[in-house]
């Protein structure tokens, strides 16, 4: 983020694994990268999920309020399941199709699990968020990152933190470079 480093921290985690269930470049009939299939592979890869969970728990132990965003609901369900194995922290979904009362209940949780779509469509959390974890590859993140910058600077208890898990293969390497330019 093109701001002073003491106002926002960015933790870029470059991730790669040569296991083909994760890193195989899949092409469509036109010979172009099939991002949708590859994102499915990325979000279903257990070692990457473990890294993601480690980041979530590290932030929670630091007293952070976290928004975890993914393009895949199944990915969020996997994270939800991992969160359910502990009892110390609260967590909930913020997804399309949920009742307003359920969304408001989720806003009170330590960890909000949402889709990029929901975070960009009128997401207005009344409780200040200070951490966003980009759990699946994405190019345009400006609006999502803005969700942790809403609290007035003088009222912040923590410096806002962006954790970007950057997949280092195929089209995702280029997406990472676009995000770095934004930061």
Q: What are these model-derived regions, one by one?
A:
Residues 71-73, 115-116:
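Helix N-cap/beta->alpha junction signal
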Residues 1-9, 183:
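Post-DEXD/H (motif II) to motif III coupling segment of the RecA-like Helicase ATP-binding lobe
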Residues 7-29, 41:
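Helicase-core coupling region on the C-terminal RecA-like lobe
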Residues 79-86, 175-183:
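Short, aromatic/basic amphipathic alpha-helical patches
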Residues 25-71, 78-82:
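Conserved interdomain hinge at the start of the Helicase C-terminal
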Residues 96-182:
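Conserved RecA-like P-loop NTPase helicase motor core
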Residues 65-67, 80-101:
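Conserved RecA-like helicase motor-core motifs
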Residues 63-64, 89, 109, 128:
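Short, high-confidence coil segments that cap the C-terminus of an alpha-helix
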């Amino acid at each position: 983020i093109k701001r002073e480093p003491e106002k926002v921290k960015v933790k870029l985690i470059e991730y790669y694994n040569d296991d083909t269930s994760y890193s195989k470049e899949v092409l469509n009939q036109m010979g172009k990268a099939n991002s949708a299939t590859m994102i499915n592979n990325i979000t279903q890869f257990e070692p990457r999920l473990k890294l993601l969970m480690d980041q979530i728990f590290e932030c929670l132990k630091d007293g952070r309020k976290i928004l975890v965003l993914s393009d895949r609901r199944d990915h969020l369900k996997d994270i939800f399941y991992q969160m359910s194995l502990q009892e110390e922290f609260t967590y909930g979904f913020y997804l399309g199709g949920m009742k307003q009362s359920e969304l408001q209940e989720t806003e009170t949780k330590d960890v909000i699990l949402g889709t990029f779509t929901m975070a960009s469509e009128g997401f207005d959390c009344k409780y200040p968020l200070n951490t966003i974890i980009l759990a699946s590859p994405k190019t345009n993140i400006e609006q999502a990152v803005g969700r942790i910058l809403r609290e007035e600077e003088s009222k912040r208890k923590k410096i806002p933190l962006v954790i970007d898990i950057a997949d280092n293969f195929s089209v995702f390497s280029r997406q990472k470079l676009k995000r770095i330019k934004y930061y």
